[in-house]
């Protein structure tokens, strides 16, 4: 097969590309330039997709012995990921930009261009597995190394996208093994640290970054009864489940800490309450997709496990499609669910699909 290897400049994508070559594929490496911000256009800058990352990717491609290109996807990234991130926070939601990048850039824009150029598949360094069932359908599964499993952030992929995707690291038992393999191959990125920041906010100051773009308008902090108990300097800076940074000048009557329960951008208010009020009995979202054949017909409940964060434990649940939404009821309450988060549903290790959470029903009445 002709394979386009997406090379971020890190160790995972470099080893994935090398394994694709070893498997006998005709491989071409490509690095995606996703930002034109001055802070990313010099060596030593943090985040991903910097000039230094591009240089690391090129060195890896040279060692592996494959052609290498840099493609400018910065405009598409700004529109589909950065602008979406700003819009979601402005609406009082908590988005996951990595999932949006996978959905709109790596497995949409990049894959579309790859197919147009005659490639058969896109290869990445994600830790996930693709399994072909008895009927020849490709299924997305968790990686062998659950500690590094990234199937959650790939939950947005459709069956058509999975048909043209390769994840060579899915069967690798540990990241240490990947680093050892990179060193044995002579790849200089073998000891390169992982990137954990949002790539377009490399200093990690999400609150300050949003304030520059959304603005910071003083508003009220309310308790669950609607009583004003404090003020904030911009509702966009808060997310459901947050405890730190609340400007409340006196303790709650029972002395227990308060947590953000809701962000209301329309009236610029933040609602807080006790930790148990974060327990959620049901979540639902209208923007859902399946990673293959839907597990059940509409209005028919099906058993699954639901995961609402990249490294959260899956929780047994019952889900169904009803009223144009994917509705999920966990067997035990979920904690700290924010609108805008993604709920990925599994059957064992297999990813069934996902939805962006629009609403969350509290398990604790007001």
Curated annotation (Swiss-Prot):
What does the record give under GO molecular function? ATP binding; tRNA binding; tRNA-uridine 2-sulfurtransferase activity
Disulphides: 101-199
| Reactions listed under catalytic activity | S-sulfanyl-L-cysteinyl-[protein] + uridine(34) in tRNA + AH2 + ATP = 2-thiouridine(34) in tRNA + L-cysteinyl-[protein] + A + AMP + diphosphate + H(+)
**Catalytic residue positions:** 101 (nucleophile), 199 (cysteine persulfide intermediate)
Q: Which GO terms describe its biological process?
A: tRNA wobble position uridine thiolation
Q: What keywords does the record list, in alphabetical order?
A: ATP-binding, Cytoplasm, Disulfide bond, Nucleotide-binding, RNA-binding, Transferase, tRNA processing, tRNA-binding
Q: Where is this region: Interaction with tRNA?
A: 148-150
Asked if the keyword tRNA processing belongs to this entry, the reply reads: yes
Task: List the Gene3D superfamilies hit by this protein, alphabetically.
Answer: Adenine nucleotide alpha hydrolases-like domains, HUPs, Translation factors
Q: CDD domains from the entry?
A: MnmA_TRMU-like
The site feature described as Interaction with tRNA is recorded at 126, 341
Report if keyword Acetylation is assigned. no
The record ties this protein, via InterPro entries, to: MnmA-like (IPR004506), MnmA-like_C (IPR046885), MnmA-like_central (IPR046884), MnmA-like_central_sf (IPR023382), Rossmann-like_a/b/a_fold (IPR014729)
Alphabetized Pfam families for the sequence: tRNA_Me_trans, tRNA_Me_trans_C, tRNA_Me_trans_M
Which residues of this UniProt protein bind ATP?
Answer: 6-13, 32, 125
Where is the protein localized?
Answer: Cytoplasm
EC number(s) on file: 2.8.1.13
Its cellular-component GO annotations read: cytoplasm
User: Which family is this sequence assigned to?
Assistant: Belongs to the MnmA/TRMU family.
Chain's role: Catalyzes the 2-thiolation of uridine at the wobble position (U34) of tRNA, leading to the formation of s(2)U34.
Q: What is this protein called?
A: tRNA-specific 2-thiouridylase MnmA
